[in-house]
Design a protein with these regions (language model features):
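Conserved glycine-rich cofactor-binding loop
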Residues: 15-17
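Substrate-binding pocket helix/loop in short-chain dehydrogenase/reductase
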Residues: 96-97, 104-109, 208
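Active-site loop immediately N-terminal to the catalytic Tyr-X3-Lys motif
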Residues: 98, 144-150, 172, 215
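Active-site helix of classical SDR
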Residues: 120, 155, 163
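Alpha-helical segment proximal to the catalytic Tyr-Lys
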Residues: 125, 168-172
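Residue(s) in the substrate-gating loop at a strand-loop-helix junction
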Residues: 139
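C-terminal substrate-recognition "lid" of short-chain dehydrogenase/reductases
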Residues: 216-243, 248
């Protein structure tokens, strides 16, 4: 497998959760990582924990000028190259099927899908130079139905489909493409979506732990290990890797 030493990696949505854990792990392995996000104080907190190998850039992935600035910052921090792009930025979108609004659905696809497509497209020339990798963060919401989560699940299903087609299209250019499908992980995403309060979090996560074959929810670091594998594995492309503690198995305990 390819070494991460001196890799240049861009991670969107790096101010907390899975993105921050990816940055921490990759920097520990010798990479230079640029993290992006909308909340500067969150990015600065992650950078302070990791150190000088981590560079930050404030921006919104839905804005073309911000996406270009993310790439430019990463190239400058990484010695003029890009080895991997991790499309992690996303929001949790929940809306009952009989209450859809067009504005809500458009925002969901703009944030979770279109921004990742456009950033990946812009990164291709740089990744071709390094025979690098693109990783999308999907979800096991595409494997197990959760009522009310159809907007979120649909955007994540789009990323799975995109992974396969993009991998087929970019294979001859030696760019690998993969998707990670995490199970339940304790992140700010659920709190920002208003699914439950910080005080309720522990009880809610305990309630879903049993849906996983391994009987517990995961950590951002465990998901980051899966992302690391897709970046480093030189003969793996087009896969949707379930890093989910077995929630996708649909285990029932009678």
């Amino acid at each position: 497998m390819r070494s991460m030493e001196d890799m240049s990696i861009l991670v969107t949505g790096g101010g907390s959760g899975i993105g921050a854990d990816c940055a921490s792990r990759f920097c520990a392995l010798g990479a230079k990582v640029t993290i992006s996000g909308r909340r500067l104080e969150k990015l600065q907190h992650v950078q302070a924990q990791i150190g000088e190998r981590c560079c930050i850039v404030q921006g919104d992935v839905t804005l073309a000028e911000d996406r270009q600035r993310m790439l430019d910052t990463c190239l400058a921090h990484g010695g003029g190259k890009l080895d991997a792009l991790v499309n992690n930025a996303a929001n949790m979108y929940r809306q009952p099927v009989d209450q859809y609004t067009e504005a809500f659905l458009r925002d969901a696809f703009e944030t979770n899908v279109i921004s990742a497509m456009m950033l990946s497209s812009a990164a291709i020339p740089h990744l071709e130079e390094t025979t690098g990798a693109i990783v999308f963060i999907g979800s096991t919401h595409t494997k197990r139905a959760f009522p009310g989560a159809s907007p979120y699940a649909t955007t994540k299903a789009a990323l799975e489909g995109l992974t396969k087609v993009m991998a087929a299209e970019l294979g001859q250019r030696q760019i690998r493409v993969g998707c990670i499908l995490p199970g339940a992980v304790s992140t700010e995403l659920n709190l920002r979506a208003g699914l439950f309060s910080a005080e309720e979090a522990s009880a809610r996560y305990d309630s879903v732990a049993g849906l996983h074959a391994l009987g517990r929810i995961g950590t951002g670091t465990e998901v980051a290990e899966g992302v690391e594998y897709l970046i480093r594995a030189e003969w793996v492309t087009g896969v949707a890797l379930e890093v989910d503690g077995g929630i996708g198995l649909g285990v029932s305990h009678f």
